[in-house]
Amino acid sequence: ISLTIDSDTVDEIYWIEEGKKLAIGTSGGIFNLYGSETSYTITPTNFSLIRDTSWEAADIKPARVGNAMIYVQFNRRKLRVLTFSGEDVQYESSEISYQADELVGKEVKELVYQKQPHSLTWCRLKDGTLASLSFEDTMPVVGWGHHTIGGTQADATLGNHAKVESMAVIPHDGRDQLWLIVKRDINGSTVRYVEFLEKFYEPSETDQELAHFVDCGLYKTASSFTTAQFAHLKDESIRILGD
């Protein structure tokens, strides 16, 4: 099936996401594609292609959260949430980043969604830091956080902190793990580490050794007053958690 979008502008298609109707993110807005009001099946002779909103999309894969979809606006400095209105039989787009202009204003480069144990949408920003969005489509509560990964990586434009270059979410042990590729300067060389975020500490945990959250942390089981395991942390500030 070959279809042409009927638009007053020449638009580039960036992504297509499934749903009750196909949502199509373009440089000219969000379109929905379906068969008809009585049959959603798309055929060469049975289709409808309608623009639901003129808020354009960026070339970044959106994140599906429940029955909603979070996508990056064309300028990469705003996030919008796309929901399907059964009453109007169309998608509706509203900004969800108005409380975090200083964060997402740094330009969003990538989105991933961590469903379990908490509903978190992670944004990789242009400066290599992360922004996290706490959001569930059934709850009218939104929260934002900013996360700078430990370590140094000299950059006259983006700053001297470590830079996250890529993200992925992988299911593991009944939860979702956020995996990162992090760029750092170590002993005069630029290196990249593959890291993952440990699970969040829950108040119900009885093991107090789990009550820490560190960057690129190492754990030593045997008692010792000296160690040679931390050469990669030369010139870095460290803290020791002792029991």
Go through the PLM ranges and name each one.
Residues 2-13, 46-55:
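Blade-loop segments of beta-propeller domains
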Residues 8-11, 54-57, 68, 75-243:
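Beta-sheet repeat architectures centered on beta-propellers
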Residues 1, 33-43, 48:
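Beta-propeller domains
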Residues 26, 34-35, 125-126:
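Short acidic-glycine loop/turn motifs at beta-strand connectors
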Residues 15-31, 54-82:
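Structured, hydrophobic secondary-structure cores that serve as assembly/anchoring elements
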Residues 31-32, 131:
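WD40 beta-propeller blade core
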